[in-house]
């Protein structure tokens, strides 16, 4: 456990040191590649402002993520209820996923208005596909022996879902949740690039427009930290409430 935590931190610190030394050694201009020390100083100088923008992005990420989960779960159940339904819906899901979200964002602004809604829709769309697919795969991955066992006890379709399929699908669901929460951060920023007056994506666009590259890098680093923290929250929830699922995934990865 300690190695899993301290090794990445050590590598990250080493990269920061190399970055700092390289910038100083080669005299790279601040507007091209600021040193980590400059990024830290300039970001801390506007801590209050950038904190508010961080909370704005976090709100969009969390709301969009929960909406994607709330829709993905029943849709996956519906899809897997019949091969015919799955064949009808799956191509539509692939179609929506293949649409570039950066190209879709300005269209959504025109359709839905210059407000929070387009950003939420983009966040939802980015997080939705991997989640619904992961849940659907988990629901149909149940061994036939378990299904036959349930039917031998005269389990109804609803009981089969709640007592067999959903518990078996938990590791798949959490795999999808981990991917979805990371992608939700990306979706929120894409939405902010196109239409926003707040958020870290807005900060990056504004900072680069005025050549405040350290602030842009600071915002980018905060986005990365946000993604890692949210990912770890999902991991912790899985370990606390579904320890057998977490152990199963760790064994599979290991």
Where are these regions (language model features)?
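Membrane-spanning helices that line or support transport/gating and their immediate boundary helices
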Residues: 77, 84-91, 134, 138-141, ...
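Transmembrane-helix boundary motif in ABC transporter permease subunits
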Residues: 63-93
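C-terminal transmembrane helix and the adjacent membrane-cytosol boundary/short C-terminal tail
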Residues: 83, 171, 217-254
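Transmembrane alpha-helices
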Residues: 121-125, 158-191, 218, 223
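Periplasmic/extracellular loop-to-transmembrane helix junction in inner-membrane transport proteins
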Residues: 2, 25-67
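Generic hydrophobic transmembrane alpha-helix motif, especially the helices
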Residues: 94-130, 137-138
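N-terminal signal-anchor transmembrane alpha helix
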Residues: 3-25
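Short cytoplasmic-facing helical segments at TM-TM junctions of multi-pass membrane proteins
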Residues: 131-134, 138-179, 200, 204
